[in-house]
């Protein structure tokens, strides 16, 4: 037999030198050859993702979410979402999506009153003026933010015992204590291990990568880094709204798909007729649809990923 000896002059039972690293099918992985799953054993490219930024907020990514993953989210998740007008972009986008293409009305159906219905994603949608992280950041007597205390009270109610996903949105993120937001979120994560708390950044204000303390950009940087470092789920409003559909970065964008004199979302719509859906998106021009379209795509990506972890 023509076998290759290892450094000790012996071979294993398969005729392979003992100093090679071989998977169970006899395929070397450490040298860049894929195993039976197509992923090298020492490769990190398959690490789980937790952040829904601009790269996830596209129809291509959305349509590639397996139907089984969507159904898993509908079967497993009971979501509570607290927000005011800017936060409504998630729900508005999800509602508009149902009228987009054949089958979307069924596959991506959801409730908003917190009453579970078979075949629909269960969401308790708490939408009212001032019901957001920006307004309710005041620190109360126990040392926690108002929104935190309201969350604890909400979860203590017997009728909310099934809630296993919860998130709050910002209104204008500028000028607020974003580290306190992170700290209070982490306290909730510690105290309610069976609930997935989803972080959010706020919309851009057209002031670019402002170095001003607690600007929208600084909030984005701080919150995103925390989520990336700690495997926390995040819907990154700032990231989504400062990127065009082709991935071009517009750091000076506002919350309406406009950077200076460039209406990059409307321009994309003009050149891509039929590739977006209508919705009444808060704080945008009536005919600018992509801001809420992208929130729907990002949200469904998040829901599917959370269900995968449940």
PLM feature spans:
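Ser/Thr/Gly/Pro-rich low-complexity, disordered linker/stalk segments of secreted
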Residues: 1-46
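N-terminal carbohydrate-binding/catalytic regions of secreted carbohydrate-active enzymes
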Residues: 51-156, 294, 298-300, 304-306
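Loop/turn elements at helix/coil->beta-strand transitions in domains of secreted/extracellular proteins
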Residues: 75-78, 103-106, 160-166, 190-198, ...
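Second-shell loop/turn segments in exported
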Residues: 77-81, 170-175, 208-213, 285-291
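Extracytoplasmic/secreted envelope proteins and their assembly/folding machinery
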Residues: 91-95, 152, 167, 178-186, ...
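Oxyanion-hole/transition-state-stabilizing segment in secreted/luminal serine hydrolases
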Residues: 142-182, 203-205
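Substrate-gating cap/lid alpha-helix
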Residues: 204-246
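Histidine-centered active-site loop/cap adjacent to the catalytic His
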Residues: 255-310
């Amino acid at each position: 037999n023509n076998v290759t000896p290892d450094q000790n002059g012996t071979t294993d039972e398969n005729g392979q030198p003992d100093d090679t690293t071989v998977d169970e099918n006899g395929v070397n992985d450490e040298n860049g050859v894929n195993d039976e799953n197509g992923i090298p054993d020492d490769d990190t490219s398959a690490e789980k993702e937790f952040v829904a930024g601009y790269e996830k907020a596209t129809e291509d990514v959305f349509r590639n979410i397996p139907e089984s993953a969507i159904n898993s989210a509908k079967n497993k998740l009971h979501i509570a979402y607290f927000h005011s007008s800017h936060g409504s972009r998630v729900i508005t986008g999800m509602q508009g999506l149902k009228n987009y293409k054949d089958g979307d009305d069924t596959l991506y159906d959801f409730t908003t009153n917190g009453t579970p219905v078979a075949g629909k994603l269960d969401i308790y949608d708490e939408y009212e003026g001032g019901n957001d992280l920006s307004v309710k950041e005041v620190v109360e007597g126990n040392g926690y933010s108002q929104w935190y205390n309201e969350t604890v009270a909400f979860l203590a109610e017997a009728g909310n015992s099934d809630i296993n996903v919860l998130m709050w949105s910002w209104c204008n993120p500028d000028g607020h204590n974003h580290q306190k937001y992170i700290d209070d979120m982490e306290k909730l994560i510690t105290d309610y291990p069976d609930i997935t708390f989803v972080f959010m950044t706020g919309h851009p204000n057209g002031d670019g990568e402002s170095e001003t303390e607690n600007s929208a950009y600084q909030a984005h940087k701080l919150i995103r880094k925390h989520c990336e470092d700690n495997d926390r789920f995040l819907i990154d409003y700032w990231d989504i709204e400062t990127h065009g559909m082709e991935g071009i970065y517009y750091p000076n964008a506002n919350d309406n798909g406009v950077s200076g004199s460039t209406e990059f979302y409307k321009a994309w719509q003009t050149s891509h007729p039929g590739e977006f859906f209508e919705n009444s998106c808060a704080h945008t021009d009536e005919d600018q649809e992509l801001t809420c379209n992208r929130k729907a795509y990002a949200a469904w990506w998040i829901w599917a990923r959370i269900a995968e972890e449940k």
